[in-house]
Amino acid sequence: NLTRRIARAAGNLGEGICIEIGPGPGGLTRALLLEGARKVIAIERDRRSIEALQDLVDAADGRLEIIEADAMDIDLTTLGDAPRRVIANLPYNVGTPMLLSWLKRAEAFESFTLMFQKEVAERISASPSTPQYGRLSIAARWRAEVFPLFDIPPRAFTPAPKITSQ
């Protein structure tokens, strides 16, 4: 299962908190809880998604909290106890600005397990002397250890986008 694979890639979920950005209907949220997350704080701005997540909140025995907000407006370093792990299938149009803002406070986070459009992921993880190397890879490598995990084909999503994710 793809969502469980992503959750396992995030490391030891049993300590600290997992911050999930844009949980939508909760596929990754369920996987985080099934993989033993002690606490998941999910930030969602879409009221319909929040309503869809309510059954999961009820079943999670206090391990899931939903914050109705735009994640760009929240200081994630104020949420829960460290260690903080950010795990997200980021909206592609705001993924890069979010990452850059979090990297400014990288010491407040244990890890980031993030999905981007493959071309953006390649720019984030690019090595010097490659065509993709630039401002984004410099910022990411300066503040974090960066490595791509796996490709996710368009057919893994409904509706299927025209791009591969990583």
What is each of the regions a protein language model found here?
Residues 1-166:
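Catalytic cores of RNA-modifying enzymes
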